[in-house]
Amino acid sequence: MAALVRGLMRRVAALPQAVRSVSGGGQRHEPYRPLPITSPLAGLPRNFRVREPPKPQKVDRWTEKRALFGVYDNVGILGGFQIHPKHLIMGPKWLRGWRGNELQRCIRKKQMVGDRMFMDDYHNLKKRIRFLYKRFNRTGKHR
């Protein structure tokens, strides 16, 4: 047994040692050029690369959101400034003429349209109500 261990130790000792140096050692991305001593990079490893800027992406300028941007801007001009564009936007039925925080809003939605919701949406709504209920009861000035 001892002879086996000695034999293995000789093999391990014969392996070449890794060369370490301050300049980084190992394979470089560019040929080695010595830096002047006054350089701010002297003594640092030279294994960093400068990345090129990303290529410009092609953007669809006529998506629905971009095409309809500013669609209600002329309401004041054409309508004699009688109505504000925010009054043209109708929200969901359960929110019209009603104000409240997010928990109250979710509970109201569950009461009014919960029976007609898809199962996944209903499940996510219940999870949100559970989370908000815990949060509102643990923190805030409304405790």
From Swiss-Prot:
Lineage of the organism: Eukaryota, Metazoa, Chordata, Craniata, Vertebrata
Protein name in UniProt: Large ribosomal subunit protein mL51
Keywords for the protein's UniProt record, in alphabetical order: Mitochondrion, Ribonucleoprotein, Ribosomal protein, Transit peptide
Oligomeric form and interacting partners: Component of the mitochondrial ribosome large subunit (39S) which comprises a 16S rRNA and about 50 distinct proteins.
Family: Belongs to the mitochondrion-specific ribosomal protein mL51 family.
Localization of this protein: Mitochondrion
GO terms for cellular component: mitochondrial large ribosomal subunit
InterPro entries found in the cross-reference section: Ribosomal_mL51 (IPR019373)
